[in-house]
Each structure stands twice: as C-alpha cells, then as structure tokens.
Amino acid sequence: MAVPKKRTSKSKRKIRKTVWREKANKAAKKAFSLARLILSGRSKSFCYTVNNKSSESSESTSIDESDDS
C-alpha cells in the first residue's frame, strides 16, 4: 500500500482548502444569481415547466415579457 513519505505542511493544507472554498463560493454565487434572474421574471432565455394545480398537464413556458416601466 502506498504511504506518503512526509506530512503535508499546514500552509499547503490551508492553501488547498482556500482554493476549494473559492470554487464552491463561485458555484454557489452563480447558482443564486441564476435563481434570482428566473424568479424575478426578467429572464428571456430560460424555458421551464409550469405545473398548474388545477390542470393535470404541464406546459412548457418561456418567459418573454416586455418592460412594463
């Protein structure tokens, strides 16, 4: 079985952990930004399914709203 010859220094562990956290934060920020865009109704490039409780069928809807201002 392969065994590491020396311990990894604290600084190297800290650097690797920081890089991992930065990647996770970037992915979370991007996902949150996309979610806000979709929920605000300003998105024009997303197609998603809308489930109506009154009807059993689902419809594919794209958001194409003009600016109401």
Curated annotation (Swiss-Prot):
InterPro entries: Ribosomal_bL32 (IPR002677), Ribosomal_bL32_plant/cyanobact (IPR044958), Ribosomal_zn-bd (IPR011332). SUPFAM superfamilies: Zn-binding ribosomal proteins. Disulfide bonds: none annotated. It holds the Pfam family Ribosomal_L32p. One of its GO terms (cellular component) is chloroplast. Keywords: Chloroplast, Plastid, Ribonucleoprotein, Ribosomal protein. Its main location: plastid. It comes from the Eukaryota. It is found in: Plastid, Chloroplast. GO terms for biological process: translation. GO terms for molecular function: structural constituent of ribosome. Belongs to the bacterial ribosomal protein bL32 family. This is Large ribosomal subunit protein bL32c. It comes from Anthoceros angustus.
